[in-house]
Design a protein with these regions (language model features):
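Extracellular and secretory-pathway beta-repeat/beta-biased strand scaffolds
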Residues: 1-149
Length: 149
């Protein structure tokens, strides 16, 4: 596709809850990918995410586009909540990446991240672009919150 917009709590996700491996998410949008905002009805943030909550390995998120924009709490991530290994996040944006803003109702920061909140190892975060903008509370992050690597 040329343009992909995920808005108002919309999500693309690949999850694993047990011992099996999670699937991968590949996004190819020649012009732009936008991940924007929160839905007060569902309480969800707009997100492209691969996550594992069990012992299985999480999938990867690979985005190829001209411009990636994550605003008002929107984000792209791979996260581990279990003992499995996290997937990798790779963003190839030929023009620019912009990450900015905090969604005021949920206080969710816009983010590009790979992280672990349990015993599993986090994956890597790779960003390739000509112009990177991080502003107004936006965050690019790799982190370990618990005993993971």
């Amino acid at each position: 596709t040329r343009r992909l917009a995920i808005e108002d709590g919309g999500q693309i996700s690949a999850s694993t809850f047990g011992a099996g491996s999670g699937g991968n998410i590949f996004v190819n949008a020649s012009e732009s990918v936008q991940v924007l905002g929160f839905s007060p009805v569902t309480g969800r943030i707009a997100m492209i995410s691969a996550r594992t909550t069990g012992s299985g390995s999480g999938g990867n998120v690979i985005i190829s586009t001209g411009r990636l924009t994550a605003l008002n709490g929107g984000g792209v991530n791979a996260v581990v909540f279990g003992s499995g290994s996290g997937g990798d996040v790779t963003v190839n944006a030929s023009e620019s990446i912009e990450v900015g803003g905090i969604e005021p109702r949920s206080l969710q920061m816009s983010v590009l991240s790979s992280s672990t909140a349990n015993a599993g190892a986090a994956g890597s975060l790779t960003i390739n672009t000509r112009r990177l903008i991080v502003r107004d509370g936006g965050r690019i992050d790799t982190s370990t919150v618990a005993s993971g690597a």
